[in-house]
Amino acid sequence: MTESKSEGTAVAAPTPEEVRQMYDDFTDPFARIWGENLHFGYWEDAGADVSVDDATDRLTDEMIALLDVRSGDRVLDVGCGIGKPAVRLATARDVRVTGISISRPQVNQANARATAAGLANRVTFSYADAMDLPFEDASFDAVWALESLHHMPDRGRALREMARVLRPGGTVAIADFVLLAPVEGAKKEAVDAFRAGGGVLSLGGIDEYESDVRQAELVVTSTVDISAQARPSLVKTAEAFENARSQVEPFMGAEGLDRMIATFRGLAEVPEAGYVLIGARKP
């Protein structure tokens, strides 16, 4: 375990290797129960009858709109999951997408998805570390990180790498967790449980996030707090795994499953737990 800092307090957090192992082991059961978008959803109205699949696609669409790409552009997807957002982006905007992940099983599934969609000629995925990208300078027209940068032990370094491989004038889109205000007591315990259980190595306020983006020599063009739209994901995740208990217990064990469900339900009671979309460009 490493130390990860949030609001000045050191807490136990998984190592990068533990994050990789988590995705190697947990991607398949999570995708079966939550869906093939391995990220939060976007609900315009928390009470609306909108499925998880539709809500997670909606969040992908918000990122597509934020990215501002043109037909033929080359896009880097940092933390590609099993490829559904990248395929949706490529289809919607007629772009070429290169996705990366530190999970080889995810990369294999993502490439299979691109092939099945008939997009293997312009959507590809590979094993790579976001903090040491294996690409030339200025080799992409756009970069996005959809709910992945919180896994980085050094978010600033990852952002600098994203900026390095982006051409001048290129755009960046980020979706990620933030803390809207400092937390203490039971709220801090809930946040710390999420950090430890969710592989969260970088978590802080919106101002801190924007500062990291600017220090990567990128210009912040928009910041949208979508905490209210993303928050239903917490309870819905807990409900989905509770309803699938018989499928998950053999893999996670009863204690591990109970801990996961409690973590998501606990974080749902923390209004300071937020979610943000950040747009940027390279001068």
UniProtKB/Swiss-Prot annotation:
Which residues are annotated as site, described as Important for catalysis? H150
SS bond partners: none
UniProt keyword terms in alphabetical order: Methyltransferase, S-adenosyl-L-methionine, Transferase
Q: Which domain of life is it from?
A: Bacteria
- Residues annotated as binding S-adenosyl-L-methionine are S101, Q106, D129, A130, L146, H151
Look up and give the organism this protein is from: Lentzea aerocolonigenes
Q: Reaction catalysed?
A: 4'-demethylrebeccamycin + S-adenosyl-L-methionine = rebeccamycin + S-adenosyl-L-homocysteine + H(+)
GO molecular function terms attached to this record: demethylrebeccamycin--D-glucose O-methyltransferase activity; S-adenosylmethionine-dependent methyltransferase activity
The lineage, from the top, is:
Bacteria, Bacillati, Actinomycetota, Actinomycetes, Pseudonocardiales
Q: Which Gene3D superfamilies match?
A: Vaccinia Virus protein VP39 (3.40.50.150)
Subunit (UniProt): Monomer.
Family the UniProt entry places it in: Belongs to the methyltransferase superfamily.
Instruction: Spell out the SUPFAM superfamilies in the cross-references.
Output: S-adenosyl-L-methionine-dependent methyltransferases
EC number(s): the record gives: 2.1.1.164
What's the stated role of this polypeptide? Glycosyl O-methyltransferase that catalyzes the final step in the biosynthesis of rebeccamycin, an indolocarbazole alkaloid that inhibits topoisomerase 1. Has broad substrate specificity and functions as glycosyl O-methyltransferase on a number of rebeccamycin analogs.
Q: Which SMART domains match?
A: PKS_MT
* Effect the entry attributes to changing S148A: Reduces enzyme activity by 50%
Name of the featured protein:
Demethylrebeccamycin-D-glucose O-methyltransferase
Activity's dependence on pH? Optimum pH is 6.5-8.
UniProt record, GO biological process: methylation
What's the encoding gene here?
Answer: rebM
